[in-house]
């Protein structure tokens, strides 16, 4: 969101296209798709369509927004008003703020960037109390030091934020696509799982200290090992090893990570983009690894079942992905089914869970085929099961 810049709201690589660009961050402002809301904008396009789809599917929006620190409070209030209808929103403002690659760091001092985060966090939450802000900084990057990176400037952001975050890549090729990650190169890095884990934990401990000993949710808003450095097999191995460590240590100080990302033109994705067709992804070994991890008990969402039966009709409440009320319907299967369908008469918007598999029913959809719940976990005889039904917002907005 750089509304004061020439060329706005066009994407930087389009309105500032130049043969002289040799690095992803060489444009006047950050080369992401632009935020079309804000002062004088609207919520018809992106990212708002994405946000509606995410909430229709029962998840919470985690929005990363780079913002020119020179914008006025009026701009921030307009952003807050954009976000008010979207329930719990995690807003990551000017992420990786102790770095030097994003445009906001190139046009402001670290002190100014930190001051802006505190101001933006305060103003946006005043006008949109559903928003939780995320401070994303380097944290502890050198294990021999007690203080975090740029602590003098950014200590104030720790109590101002609702959620703490560090972006950690166990391997990363930031020179992509302009060069190749080869031995001796200076546009990529590779660390270890143990080192990444320890830096993340030490960052949390330092953040807690700077918050007067009171903890807040600790996340990694970006996490992966770049297959462009490691190759696809060791990428999967490193992701598995990190998650094994979280589970083995029962790391309840750690709240979440965002795997970056689902599909990538390089080799960061669970899928890589098919170079012949950008609409198609090619699954990587880490996709199966990630699928196995999120189905472990330690990483699965918890559901509490109330005793007794309810009297229909009932109202299904959806607050966010960790706070909702649904229906549990007992089912008896004589054997592994040949067909398993749910048929609906109403234009409801539902998330359904059966045998550990989630299904989405959009408004207008009449039949949901749930046989996929048994492809990988077939029944070997009679079984009593439970169909769980939740009703997120049908429009994606409150």
Segments predicted by a language model, with ranges:
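Active-site clefts of carbohydrate-active enzymes
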Residues: 63-65, 102, 172, 176, ...
């Amino acid at each position: 969101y750089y509304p004061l810049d020439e060329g706005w709201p066009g994407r930087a690589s389009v309105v500032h296209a130049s043969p002289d660009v040799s690095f992803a961050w060489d444009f006047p402002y950050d080369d992401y798709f632009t935020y079309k809301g804000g002062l004088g904008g609207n919520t018809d396009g992106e990212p708002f369509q994405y946000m509606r789809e995410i909430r229709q599917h029962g998840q919470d929006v985690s929005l990363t927004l780079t913002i020119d620190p020179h914008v006025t409070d009026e701009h921030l209030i307009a952003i807050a008003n954009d976000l008010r209808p979207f329930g719990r929103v995690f807003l990551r403002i000017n992420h990786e703020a102790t770095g030097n690659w994003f445009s906001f760091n190139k046009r402001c001092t670290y002190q100014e960037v930190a001051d802006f985060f505190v101001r933006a966090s305060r103003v946006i939450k005043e006008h949109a109390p559903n928003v939780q802000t995320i401070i994303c900084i380097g944290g502890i990057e050198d294990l021999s030091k007690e203080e975090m990176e740029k602590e003098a400037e950014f200590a104030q952001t720790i109590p101002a934020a609702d959620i703490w975050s560090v972006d950690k890549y166990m391997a990363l090729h930031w020179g992509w696509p302009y060069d190749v990650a080869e031995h001796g190169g200076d546009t990529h890095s590779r660390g270890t799982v143990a080192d990444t884990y320890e830096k993340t934990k030490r960052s949390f401990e330092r953040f807690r200290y700077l918050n007067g000993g009171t903890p807040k949710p600790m996340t990694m808003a970006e996490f992966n090992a770049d297959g462009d450095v490691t190759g696809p097999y060791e990428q999967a191995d490193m992701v598995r090893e990190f998650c094994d460590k979280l589970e083995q240590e029962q790391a309840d100080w750690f709240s979440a990570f965002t795997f970056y990302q689902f599909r990538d033109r390089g080799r960061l994705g669970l899928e890589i983009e098919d170079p012949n067709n950008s609409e198609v992804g090619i699954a990587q070994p880490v996709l199966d690894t990630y699928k196995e991890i999120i189905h472990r008990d330690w990483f699965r969402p918890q559901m509490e079942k109330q005793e007794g039966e309810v009297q229909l009709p009932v109202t299904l409440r959806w607050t966010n992905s960790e706070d909702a009320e649904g229906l549990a319907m007992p089912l008896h299967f004589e054997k592994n089914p040949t067909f398993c369908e749910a048929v609906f008469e109403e234009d409801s918007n539902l998330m359904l869970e059966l045998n550990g598999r989630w299904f989405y029913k959009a408004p207008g959809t009449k039949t949901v085929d749930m046989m996929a719940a048994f492809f990988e976990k077939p029944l070997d005889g009679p079984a009593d099961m439970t169909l769980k039904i939740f009703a997120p917002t049908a429009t994606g907005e409150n």
